[in-house]
């Protein structure tokens, strides 16, 4: 039994084990599993009915969870989990969701709950709920404008004044004698090494003790101070008015000299310090031209008559290969009295023998005289008779060392280096005009003295035509013009009719031919052929040459190639030289034409050319002297070249290389060709080429009576020779002459490039002569009275001085009668002067001979000063001793306030002066003056004023006018010390954009298309008409002009002078930095710029670029402006701020320009490999992109499209740079300001561009809308939407608050403005914009041009009491109209030339009041409602407060109306109230109708500055550009 009992549970044990395993889940603790296993035997014992046998059986060994080593245990555990645990969990979930949860819900919903409350409680709960929702919407959703990231106004950059290391007036880096000397001879311009050594070889020094005097009248040389201080005195009295050479000047009308009582005192002219010259510009000219003859007629005729037999007067003698030989080989014998006169350039009084002596000294020159005599004694006697320093005495203040270059050195330099001499003379003549003539004419009113020089010059330049062509031939010429005059209209005739020139068509071909032949000849051997060039058989001349024979000209060919008049055809002489035969081939074809049609015209041209060349000093004797100079040029070490292959290299930088600053030759070898052909010893003179050129260029022109040939202030177009008729030379009486110093003349537009020099006159004369284009403007322009000075008769020349020396005309030239003139363009004269130095030397000699004594003394006192970039000229608080006139460069006046704060007072460009007021009042300097870039100045000492005032009392009147004008400017624009940034913005940019002469275009980083940008800007500047034209320069242009050594150390002097001449010639020069960062051209662009445009791509990274880092490293103080190029006409909000944030050096503003460009950056100089493949791929890509848009049926037009060309972005930038910006000022007036929208639409329809927008109150709102997109359509829509919001009475009522500060919270007003502008910033606007506010915390007006638009527009519209002030950086801002409701004055400071000012403010009630000394409020109310009362109603309390607030605004409004250039407009909107925004359409129509009517009235009066008129004139000039109306 026991065994059976023991064996019964054994088969159940595995089941128990499986049960144990199934109950022992992995997550059950082991303790629970153990207790369960211990209770299992007891349970099994109860079930089986047996007593417990646990004590008899051992515990089961397999009751623990299966281990990983037991595979069967794992399988059992998994089966238990799947088939038992998971179903149990699912069962529980289903039971809870279907039974338990519904039961709970049923129980909950079956319960009853009752709440009891009154209506007040319910209403409070609802109000609380609504308030919560309203608060959330109001303060969390609708006022996002208050949670914008803070963007304060951009502070104006602090001015960088780099420390000045120089003391006072000391020169930079002067440490020794040589530096002092080099500083003094800078007046000569660029000197190459041989010229410099030759000039200084015989220099002497002299020591003066303190108090010692030196009679400069006895000194014959160039004097300069090396060390010490010298005072220059002038003798105060002298009988008569003498010229430089001691001769009494004719026509001088200075009665003051005879009115003296005979005092022989001395007046202090100036003080000369270290490194300055004691000689004047005129005295230097006289040293170079001591032996030049003034008039060629007597000398040439006598010499020619002595040379030629009397029957041969009809056959002029050509110029020989050897100056000492005649046609038959016999030596020339010149009379004694003509020996000195025939020597034109060298200092010797006799012609050199055929083989020049191999020496350089002048002392042995007399031994080579053919007669064995020397004229040195005569020269000494002549020098004693005349002095280059008349009446001048120098006194040393301290022990002084002076250096003297004797006159012999200048004579030797003239003989050895004629072209270098001509270059020096050209430089001095240019500085003479800029310094002495301009100062005397403009500042001192010495118009008669300056203009008298040109009047007296006519006695040297008048040559009559031969008699045989003044009779029937001239009548036939007139008949041709009369026929053409009848055919053409009056307007065409006024511009001039030119006779057809048959040679003009071959002009360019012959020029290239000349260059080739010159190169050929330079490589040819130089044979000795004394007279083989000239053919003994000369054609017969059928006309008399009693006056001037054409054969007297500088030519190796027969000039009169026409036979007798009865001959049917003309023939050309046969020249033995193959080279000259080749030269003559172009003209041979033209000569075989009908004699009666072509030859007569050509004869006129030949004769006119004869007279012109005699007038300018090109005569046989001068040619002989030139040939001597050429022979002696053999001695020049620079000219010796033993390798013909290296000749080109030798002469590419020769000492005679005259820098032609005005003629941009496309041939880089032109200069060297000229040098070789002119200065080669022996050989054929290239005069034949020049002769051919001049015949090609000369024109015969007819002008009717009243036509203007030259306008006052313009550069001379060329030389006019009067054939028949009279020219009247005069000046405008009301002309102040300020423009003659070089300042800009806004009303005078000239073309930019002289592609057709012969048409220069027509391009300027049409503005006066043509009356059909703009009759109103022309009649108004002719209103100023004109004063006639003198007349030019037949045989006279006009424009000799101006055209030869490239001066501007001080007079205008009008045809007194119908006049026939020969015209030689200025470019031809410049070519002539370049090849033949005698022309400039003759001009210089004549100028020095005609100089009045007064101008000579002024020239002595004026000092030419050159300062470096950043150099301080004088400091604030220094003693004022001189006035400074800017000749070239740019200056800036800076006022240093409290705490070292720098404020820009003004900038002074070319032609402007600074310092008059303090010099005249003997006060200290009010500001520091420093040079922005390398600058040339004319220093006008105060001692000169004192001397002139005592001796010439008439000058004091002119000086008094000058001081009065400066005082008036100071009163109107006081230089007050502004300590706050809000108002200094207008002062810092006071005159910074006026008179900009150079603009540098610099990319921010590589890949910016600056070349394309520069070309488009150049085109825009040309279209708007820059005074004197505009040109652009890049590295290729510079290398083409000056060669590959332009940027070397030696070439920098050439480059600087070339750039200075360009800036003097053109009104504006663009420097395009199209090279690498560290290239010399990039450095030149930065150092030469008055204003630097930093160009960047708006969508690219705003990080600082490599070009900017290079710019900052150069430490330039020029004005810097940022230009952002956009592919589309849109600027995302905040983009501009990112660019300006890291660029504190941008001190001139920024511009948004739309320009299509490639988004992929390209290097400045891409490699040329696979260029064709790359271009082909790019073209294909561009075609595909274009076809994507052009193939669509519907083309989406942009929001804005410029309807007129001058409304483009480049034209806007061009007007800003030229100072011709158009400003729009919108005044405040509440709802009446809706009329602004209508007026702006009228301006748009009239085609008037707007460049700057400023506004006050509602004007700030409308102006901001217009400046944002520069279009009327979005402005109209947004303005109407805003007016609808403001017209809602409910919005106003919901915004009411307790009136502790204001009646409304301002939220609805803020929301209306913010919904219009969004988060845009003022910097992102397409047009420049500003608005003004009243800072009641600091009691001043502020102008805002940066920051969030909505804030400052809201501040400008904040009426006191209605809206709370806007808080800005701790200050409270209110409506700007309280101080200035029409900000015309501030707009003027931003550079606007024409300002449209629209005033919509309320009109003050000026009704006289008479209610007595006391006033009852009750009576006032009754009187207001009494219709029968005749007493006007007294103002209410609110009206009195309003009038009090606008007191200063009314005063500023009256001033604004009188500001020059302001066009005041006031639409008839007085019947509308300040808050009547509901009448939007009606007020808009009133403004639109008024604007159209006003602009039409201005247009009919000719007062509208419409760019269309200028464009019309430019189109007219462009149609004239190819040629005048020709026969």
Swiss-Prot record:
Comp. bias regions, Polar residues: 364-377
Sample GO molecular function, one term: lysophospholipase activity
Lumenal side stretches: 95-116
Membrane topology: Multi-pass membrane protein
Active site: 1257 (nucleophile), 1375 (proton acceptor)
Keyword Membrane: yes
Intervals of motif GXSXG: 1255-1259
Activity regulation description: Inhibited by organophosphorus esters.
Residue span(s) of domain PNPLA: 1224-1388
Extent of Low complexity compositional bias: 299-310
Similarity section: Belongs to the NTE family.
Protein name (Swiss-Prot/TrEMBL): Lysophospholipase nte1
């Amino acid at each position: 039994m026991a065994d059976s009992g023991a064996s019964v549970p054994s088969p159940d044990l595995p089941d128990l084990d499986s049960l144990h395993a199934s109950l022992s889940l992995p997550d059950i603790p082991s303790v629970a599993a153990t207790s369960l296993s211990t209770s299992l035997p007891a349970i099994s014992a109860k079930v089986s009915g047996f007593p417990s046998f646990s004590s008899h059986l051992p515990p089961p060994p397999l009751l623990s969870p299966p281990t990983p080593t037991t595979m069967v245990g794992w399988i059992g555990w998994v089966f238990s989990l799947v088939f038992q645990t998971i179903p149990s969990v699912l069962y529980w979930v289903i039971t809870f969701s279907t039974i338990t949860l519904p039961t709970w819900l049923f129980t909950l919903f079956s319960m009853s709950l009752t709440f009891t409350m009154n209506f007040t409680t319910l209403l409070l709960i609802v109000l609380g709920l609504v308030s919560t929702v309203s608060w959330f919407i109001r303060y969390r959703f609708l006022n996002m404008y208050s949670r914008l990231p803070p963007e304060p106004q951009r502070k104006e950059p602090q001015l960088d004044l780099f420390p000045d290391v120089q003391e006072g007036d000391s020169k930079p880096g002067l440490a020794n004698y040589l530096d002092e000397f080099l500083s003094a001879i800078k007046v000569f311009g660029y000197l190459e090494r041989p010229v410099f050594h030759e000039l200084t070889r015989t220099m002497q020094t002299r020591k003066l003790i303190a108090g010692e005097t030196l009679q400069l009248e006895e000194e014959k040389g160039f004097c300069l101070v090396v060390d010490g201080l010298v005072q220059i005195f002038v003798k105060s009295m002298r009988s008569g008015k003498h010229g430089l050479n001691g001769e009494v000047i004719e026509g001088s009308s200075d009665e003051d000299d005879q009115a003296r009582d005979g005092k022989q005192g001395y007046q202090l002219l100036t003080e000369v310090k270290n490194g300055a010259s004691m000689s004047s510009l005129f005295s230097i000219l006289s040293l170079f031209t001591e032996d030049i003859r003034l008039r060629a007629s007597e000398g040439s005729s006598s010499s020619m008559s002595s040379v030629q037999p009397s029957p041969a007067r009809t056959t002029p003698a050509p110029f020989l290969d050897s100056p000492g030989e005649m046609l038959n080989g016999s030596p020339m014998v010149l009379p004694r009295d003509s020996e000195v006169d025939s020597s034109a350039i060298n200092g010797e009084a006799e012609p050199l023998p055929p083989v020049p002596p191999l020496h350089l000294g002048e002392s042995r020159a007399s031994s080579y005289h053919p007669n064995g005599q020397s004229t040195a004694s005569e020269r000494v006697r002549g020098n004693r008779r005349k002095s280059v320093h008349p009446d001048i005495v120098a006194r040393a203040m301290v022990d002084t060392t002076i250096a003297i270059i004797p006159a012999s050195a200048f004579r030797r330099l003239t003989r050895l280096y004629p072209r270098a001499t001509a270059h020096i003379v050209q430089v001095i003549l240019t500085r003479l005009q800029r310094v002495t003539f301009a100062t005397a004419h403009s500042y001192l009113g010495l118009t008669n003295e300056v203009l008298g020089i040109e009047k007296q010059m006519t006695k040297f330049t008048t040559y009559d035509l031969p008699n045989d062509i003044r009779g029937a031939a001239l009548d036939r010429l007139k008949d041709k013009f009369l026929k053409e005059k009848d055919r053409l209209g009056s307007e065409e005739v006024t511009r001039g009719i030119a006779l057809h020139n048959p040679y003009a068509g071959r002009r360019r071909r012959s020029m290239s031919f000349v260059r080739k032949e010159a190169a050929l000849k330079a490589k040819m051997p130089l044979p000795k052929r004394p007279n083989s060039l000239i053919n003994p058989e000369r054609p017969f001349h059928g006309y008399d040459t009693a006056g001037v024979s054409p054969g007297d000209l500088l030519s190796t060919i027969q000039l009169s190639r026409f036979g007798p008049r009865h001959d049917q055809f003309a023939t050309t002489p046969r020249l033995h030289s193959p080279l000259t035969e080749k030269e003559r081939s172009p003209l041979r074809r033209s000569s075989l034409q009908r004699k009666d049609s072509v030859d007569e015209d050509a004869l006129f041209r030949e004769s006119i050319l004869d007279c012109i060349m005699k007038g300018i000093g090109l005569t046989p004797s001068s040619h002989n002297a030139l040939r001597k100079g050429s022979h002696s040029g053999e001695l020049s070490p620079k000219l010796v070249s033993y390798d013909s292959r290296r000749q080109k290299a030798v002469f590419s930088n020769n000492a005679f290389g005259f820098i032609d600053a005005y003629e941009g030759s496309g041939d880089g070898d032109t200069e060297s060709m000229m040098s070789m052909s002119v200065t080669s010893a022996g050989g054929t003179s290239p005069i034949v080429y020049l002769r051919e050129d001049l015949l090609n260029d000369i024109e015969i022109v007819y002008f009717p009576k009243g036509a203007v040939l030259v306008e006052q202030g313009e550069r001379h177009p060329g030389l006019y020779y009067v054939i028949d008729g009279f020219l009247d030379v005069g000046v405008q009486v009301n002309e102040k002459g300020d423009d003659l110093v070089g300042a800009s003349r806004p009303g005078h537009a000239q073309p930019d490039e002289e592609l057709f020099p012969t048409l220069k006159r027509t391009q300027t004369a049409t503005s006066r002569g043509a009356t059909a284009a703009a009759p109103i403007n022309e009649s108004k322009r002719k209103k100023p009275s004109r004063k006639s000075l003198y007349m030019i008769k037949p045989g006279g020349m006009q424009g000799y001085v101006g055209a030869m020396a490239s001066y501007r005309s001080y007079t205008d030239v009008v045809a007194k009668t119908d006049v026939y003139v020969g015209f030689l363009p200025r470019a031809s004269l410049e070519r002539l002067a370049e090849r033949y130095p005698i022309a400039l030397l003759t001009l210089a000699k004549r100028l020095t001979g005609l100089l009045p004594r007064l101008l000579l003394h002024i020239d002595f006192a004026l000092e030419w000063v050159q300062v470096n970039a950043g150099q301080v000229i004088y400091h604030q608080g220094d003693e004022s001793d001189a006035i400074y006139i800017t000749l070239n460069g740019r200056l800036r006046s800076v006022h240093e306030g409290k705490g070292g704060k720098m404020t820009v007072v003004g900038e002074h460009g070319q032609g402007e002066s600074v310092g008059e007021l303090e010099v005249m009042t003997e006060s200290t300097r009010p500001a520091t003056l420093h040079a922005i870039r390398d600058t040339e100045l004319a220093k006008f000492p105060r001692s000169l004023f004192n001397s002139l005032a005592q001796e010439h009392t008439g000058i004091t009147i002119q000086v008094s006018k000058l001081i009065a004008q400066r005082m008036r400017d100071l009163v109107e624009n006081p230089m007050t010390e502004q300590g706050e940034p809000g108002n200094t913005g207008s002062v810092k940019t006071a005159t910074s954009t006026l008179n900009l002469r150079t603009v540098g275009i610099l990319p921010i980083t590589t890949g910016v298309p600056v070349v394309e940008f520069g070309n488009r800007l150049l085109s825009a500047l040309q279209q708007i008409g820059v005074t004197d034209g505009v040109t652009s320069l890049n590295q290729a242009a510079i290398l083409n002009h000056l060669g590959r050594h332009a940027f070397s150390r030696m070439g920098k002097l050439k480059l600087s002078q070339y750039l200075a001449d360009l800036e003097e010639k053109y009104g504006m020069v663009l420097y395009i930095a199209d090279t690498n960062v560290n290239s010399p051209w990039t450095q030149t662009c930065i150092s030469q710029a008055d204003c630097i445009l930093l160009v960047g791509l708006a969508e690219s990274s705003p990080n600082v670029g490599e070009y900017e880092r290079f710019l900052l490293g150069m430490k330039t103080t020029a004005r810097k402006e940022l230009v952002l190029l956009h592919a589309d006409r849109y600027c995302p909000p905040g983009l501009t701020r990112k660019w300006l944030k890291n660029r504190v050096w941008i001190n001139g503003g920024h511009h948004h320009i739309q320009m299509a460009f490639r988004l992929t950056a390209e290097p400045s100089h891409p490699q040329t490999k696979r260029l064709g493949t790359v271009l082909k791929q790019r073209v294909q890509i561009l075609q595909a992109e274009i076809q994507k848009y052009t193939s669509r049926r519907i083309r989406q037009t942009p929001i804005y499209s410029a309807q007129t060309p001058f409304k483009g972005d480049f034209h806007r930038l061009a007007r800003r740079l030229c100072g011709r910006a158009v400003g729009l000022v919108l005044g405040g007036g509440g709802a009446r300001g809706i009329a602004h929208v209508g007026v702006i639409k009228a301006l748009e329809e009239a085609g008037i561009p707007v460049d700057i927008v400023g506004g006050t109150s509602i004007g700030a709102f409308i102006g901001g809308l217009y400046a944002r997109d520069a279009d009327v359509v979005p402005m109209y829509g947004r303005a109407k939407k805003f007016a609808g919001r403001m017209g809602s009475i409910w919005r106003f009522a919901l915004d009411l608050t307790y009136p502790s500060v204001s009646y409304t919270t301002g939220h609805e007003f803020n929301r209306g403005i913010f919904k219009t502008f969004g988060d845009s910033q003022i910097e992102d606007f397409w047009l420049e914009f500003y608005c003004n506010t009243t800072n009641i915390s600091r009691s001043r007006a502020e102008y805002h041009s940066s920051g969030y638009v909505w804030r400052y527009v809201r501040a400008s519209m904040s009426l006191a009491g209605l809206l709370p002030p806007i808080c800005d950086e701790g200050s409270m801002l209110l409506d700007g109209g309280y101080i200035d409701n029409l900000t015309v004055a501030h707009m003027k400071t931003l550079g606007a030339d024409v300002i449209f000012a629209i005033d919509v403010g309320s009109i003050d009630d000026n009704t006289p009041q008479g209610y007595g000394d006391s006033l009852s409020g009750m009576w006032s109310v009754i009187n207001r409602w009494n219709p029968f009362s005749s007493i006007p109603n007294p103002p209410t309390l609110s009206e009195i407060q309003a009038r009090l607030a606008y007191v200063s605004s009314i005063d500023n409004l009256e001033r604004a109306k009188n500001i020059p250039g302001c066009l005041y407009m006031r639409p008839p909107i007085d019947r509308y109230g300040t808050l009547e925004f509901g009448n939007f359409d009606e007020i808009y129509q009133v403004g639109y109708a008024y604007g159209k009517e006003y602009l039409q009235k201005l247009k009919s009066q000719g007062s509208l500055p419409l760019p269309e008129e200028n464009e019309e004139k430019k189109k007219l000039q462009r149609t004239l550009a190819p040629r005048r109306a020709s026969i």
